[in-house]
Amino acid sequence: MYQTTAALRSAFLEFFRSNGHQVVDSSSLVPGNDPTLLFTNAGMNQFKDVFLGMDKRSYTRATTAQRCVRAGGKHNDLDNVGYTARHHTFFEMLGNFSFGDYFKEDAIRFGWTFLTEVLKLPKERLCVTVYQTDDEAFEIWNKKIGVAAENIIRIGDNKGAPYASDNFWQMGDTGPCGPCTEIFYDHGDHIWGGRPGSPEEDGDRFIEIWNIVFMQYNRQASGEMLPLPKPSVDTGMGIERIAAIMQGVHSNYEIDIFRALIAKAAEIIGVTDLSNKSLRVIADHIRSCAFLVADGVMPSNEGRGYVLRRIIRRAVRHGNKLGATEAFFYKLVPTLIEVMGDAAKGLADTQVIVEKALKAEEEQFARTLERGLGILDSALNELQGDTLDGETVFKLYDTYGFPVDLTADVCRERNIIVDEAGFEAAMAEQRSRAQAAGNFGADYNAALKIDAETAFCGYSELTGNAKVTALYLNGESVPAINAGDDAVVVLDVTPFYAESGGQVGDKGVLVAQGIEFAVSDTQKFGQASGHKGTLTAGSLSVGQVLEAKVDKKLRHRTQLNHSVTHLLHAALRQVLGTHVTQKGSLVDPERLRFDFSHFEAVKPAELKQVEELVNTQIRRNHELKVAEMAIDEAKEKGAMALFGEKYDAQVRVVTMGDFSIELCGGTHVGRTGDIGLFKITSEGGIAAGVRRIEAVTGAAAMAYVAQQQAQLEEAAALLKGDTQSVVAKLKAQLDKMKQLEKDMQQLKDKLAAAASADLACDAVVVNGVNVLIKKLDGVEAGALRGLQDELKQKLKSAVILLGVAQEGKVNLIAGVSNDLVGKVKAGELVAMVAAQVGGKGGGRPDMAQAGGSQPENLDAALSQVLPWITERLA
């Protein structure tokens, strides 16, 4: 009964549903309401605001089977995964919660009843822990539940500070906290380990299966513990641990879910030893990677995306270690969906996208994996001592895409540690170089610290009077500036938009009688807006009143491009999938640039579909509606928020019909029809997993279309036709070119045949074998293959090496007749010569080609060929 993981999950949720709990779906692995969390790592994450009293639900009891990831950040199990019985990057946390409803006695009774009556675990196999001073919990266990006192273990402050204990939970330095009680299962005396609190507690005999937290205090900054008005309960039980117990196995990797994934991975790769730890790593990692992609995380070089990339690459490396020769990881997704059952619904809905994303990342890493592993292996073989230097670790990271933990994983297998401090130093040095390379001018934003606020009135007004509150010249605060000075002007209120969210700062003028300040840019300095520019007339002092005038034409063109990025974002998500998220943007009066997460190049047909979708929304002339609301309300309405952006409690929401809704502080058109026309000008990759679209709108789009039309007409004229016949005429020209190339090759072959007759006379005989070594002049590299074939036919039993030096390059070809490949291999011969002319190459035993970059060394290299061949023909 309840042998499978799926059955356990259902039994748990049904038990608590029947006891008045609301069954709540697992939340996303990407926390929606907690910027402090990288990933959802506990069942209580989605209820954090409820526990803090900031959110109220229609229920006071809840139960969940929450998907969790612990990799990266504070909670990071990645290094141990595969090497222990219970560490995972992904796990499911079964939990029940009380929000000011029941408390200690009911929480304890629910847990004990489920374990002993529903799952029928032997009571004698269970023991419990309580916080040292939690007499109430001790009494409940002992008097109400009937657990013998010797099986109730008090745990004190065992982590070096008051309330720092395995049995005292706290959300942070202040806020809700309280004691907890934990239930442990005894796997038997055949396994090493001691009871909780004993010196041997880290063994695997006694395993914690359920943690019940009693949130009863509100910790003050002073350390004082004040009682909460409504104590609550937060519990958690890892489904993998309880499944291992129910299935009679000791390791989590032996339960049904992992058995199926390990077997499938072994089948795909061709491995027979199912106990191999690398199979454990792969089976664990496919769970976290697949569900992260399903929840919208894409591999990238920052934040959550980089953690995902690290996990994928670790799995790929372990596959390589097992002998995988092609992409295998993504092929585990169907098996994962099958074994996860109801918990995989979201994954099943996004299966195609998940498989494509994993395959793309795996194939990309495969291009550098072998070479990187070769360099690492060489470094480890030459290592003196037990520490790999930080420079090598950095080179593997920077050049071959090896995350530090992947390098550490390889080193661990050889009892080598990595110099993480040296790696960090190399990283810091690279950042300094990059920063220095980017500092082409003064960085006002970094240099100026302005303790002032500027009110923004530019959503509705483009002109207005304002008082000068500060002036900065050469980074220093000054009371006045004079004509010709390049400065930063700070106003108390401004219609100028300061660069933010990808939208460039406004340009315009600040004027008064006899004074004109030309604003070339507007930037944020904390809460102040700084107007950068030049005082072109008069003198200006702090306290003066000016009229601020934004350049209306530039602002209007910028607004067109900003509004269309919202439409573009929504269109990309419709066409490519909801995994698409904005990674960056640039919106100026001339064009727009939009960076987004996607695992492959956008196909021409997809780009066309995106463009048509955006233009359809433009033609529908939606009114842009702007509203301010609480951020939680905005997210409930489906507003897109950007990861990494910091939002206030009140946010600005921009809606375009039923097509797009985003959080945005930028300026926009009144209706989508104002945009006029949208035209994509380019699409390409800028980083692994990140694509970029560049586009134009309005008059710029019309000009772009006109330019394209003009080029089409010019091409038609060159082809002596009209625009309708360009494609047909180009095809005809290409066919003609192919025929000419074919005719030319035939001529080259005839010339090669004629030349071979003369060259054959230059062959020398070595031990009865014709050997021809020749440097050729005036012969195209493309003709070498045909020439070599002709010579082999003429010379019969022969070894041939031909070289051509032209335009600073060397081309080599080696040919060996079939009767001689047992003694002389063309690939080895050509590789030997190529190494001496700055190149490399290879091929079959009977024919091989190579190139080089040092033609000046060709004669010397060829002089060594005859002795090399003679030695092998002896």
Swiss-Prot record:
GO biological process terms, semicolon-separated: alanyl-tRNA aminoacylation; negative regulation of DNA-templated transcription
Residue numbers binding Zn(2+): H562, H566, C664, H668
TM regions (residue ranges): none
Protein's cellular compartments: Cytoplasm
Cofactor, how bound (note): Binds 1 zinc ion per subunit.
EC number: 6.1.1.7
GO MF: alanine-tRNA ligase activity; aminoacyl-tRNA deacylase activity; ATP binding; tRNA binding; zinc ion binding
Cofactor dependency: Zn(2+)
Keywords recorded for this protein, A-Z: Aminoacyl-tRNA synthetase, ATP-binding, Cytoplasm, Ligase, Metal-binding, Nucleotide-binding, Protein biosynthesis, RNA-binding, tRNA-binding, Zinc
Protein origin, superkingdom: Bacteria
UniProt-listed PANTHER family: ALANINE--TRNA LIGASE, CYTOPLASMIC, ALANYL-TRNA SYNTHETASE
Similarity comment: Belongs to the class-II aminoacyl-tRNA synthetase family.
UniProt protein name: Alanine--tRNA ligase
The species this protein was found in: Shewanella sp. (strain MR-4)
